Amino acid sequence: FISVFLIFYSRLNKKFENTKGTQIIMRYTLRALTIDQFSRIASTICAAEILRKENSNLFGDKEITLGLWVGQKQTPNWYSEAAKVINNPNSQAESTPRQLINCPCCKNQLLYTAQDDEKKINVECVSPESKNTCEIQKKLNSLPILTVDECLYNNLPTFLLATIDKFAQIIRKDEALGFLGKKGFSSPPSLIIQDELHLITGPLGTLT
């Protein structure tokens, strides 16, 4: 609730009117927990994006998006890797952009497609059964989620979910500095949330 409030409050104040900043960062210690929370938060972000589109005069034209930033074993680092997985229906790759399987609204399976001209992964609800009932299918051309590192760097998400081990790499990944408002015209986040703080020990905890 606090995160969504901050997103809309900032837009009402025009703070993010001309920026590409990440406003909320939530960090988890366990990758499995991060993936689980990603599917839950996706429904909230989709609802927020629908609300923004319906009230663009108040909240601006910039899309409200959700990003997932975890290890390479879970999600691809590059768009080209993600496109190969999506374009090959028989792919058994463990690293995949398909981290959200079902539509948060109607629960039907989502369709992932690769858009090479913009290096973008489109995520759509196209189920015929929910054509007239699914708010996401009716109001969003593509779900506002990003699961490929390259796409995250090029289009900073409004809300970023990350694991602390991935986040620790920010000191040697110049392209990731945008998440903290340290690159280009991006603004720093309004809120950083660390989940399960007591689990962070040793050098990793010191670094993060």
Per-region residue spans from a language model:
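N-terminal helicase ATP-binding lobe
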Residues: F1-T208
